[in-house]
Amino acid sequence: MAAAGLPVPPGFVVAAGAFSDFLDACGGAAMIAGVTNDLDVDDRRAVEHAAERIQQLIVSTPLPVPLARAILAAHRKLEHGNLVAVRSSAVSEDGLTASFAGQQESYLNVSADAVLDRVRECWASFFSPRALFYRAQKAVLADTRMAVVVQEMVQADKSGVMFTVDPIRNRRTCMVIEGAPGLGEGIVSGEVTPDHYVVSRDDGSVLEFFVPDEERSRVLSDQELDGLRMLGLRLEAFFGSPQDVEWCSRAGELLLLQSRPITTLGAHG
């Protein structure tokens, strides 16, 4: 997103190749292959045991010194990097048919001395029982491509999610935007009920909206909704497909935190 000139918090990426190198160095790649080759994903205890073995290996193995130094050096370059968000970013070899949204962990308000641990914990979350079961359903169980994004922590006034087309009713003429005060992790996890808006992709007009708390006004103004719409269109143009986006606003500035393909759309709509 940064390469497209879109507004994102400063940060850096621990590339998927670093995870692969880590697994090769600690013997994890061979162990994971052995554990998952004949795994019966319908056997809950077997899946939990496999997950525990893999995750324990990852979190108990120190990062290679060159990688640890590179991560800490990149962290020191962040102007306001005292606290960061450490976000998982997993993509299968066929990323348009398997979205890993919600399968891995992300961490907020991470201090400098905890960054390396949180990177390993993000990697380990790729092998949670839920994630193993999900990838088995998508026939990508052996895929171990996992990047980690480290961003300056944004103390947001408002946060939410945006779908650049309507994924529920399969409407490609409108966007669905949800927003709530403060940080947005509660929306993503389902703990917070946000405002819900449906806006026209063409002109930004608000077609529908729902505010769950009748005692407060809308979280997002028409101007903010239109700003998000414009960013959504730019994201689609950059990635080439409808997007599921996490966003936030700080002092009136809209920032994009994460974007992934929407994988639940039908062929027509």
Q: Which positions does each model-derived feature cover?
A:
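Short conserved beta-strand segments at catalytic cores or DNA/RNA-binding microdomains
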Residues: 165-167
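N-terminal beta-alpha lobe that positions the nucleotide/phosphoryl donor
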Residues: 1-149, 158, 220-223, 230-240, ...
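Short hydrophobic-aromatic micro-motifs
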Residues: 8, 14, 174-178, 188, ...
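Short beta-strand scaffold segments in enzyme catalytic cores
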Residues: 160-163
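Short beta-strand segments
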Residues: 87, 151, 176-178
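Short, flexible loop/turn elements at secondary-structure junctions
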Residues: 90, 152-154, 181, 249-251, ...
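Conserved catalytic alpha/beta cores of large enzymes that bind or transform nucleotide phosphates
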Residues: 174-251, 269
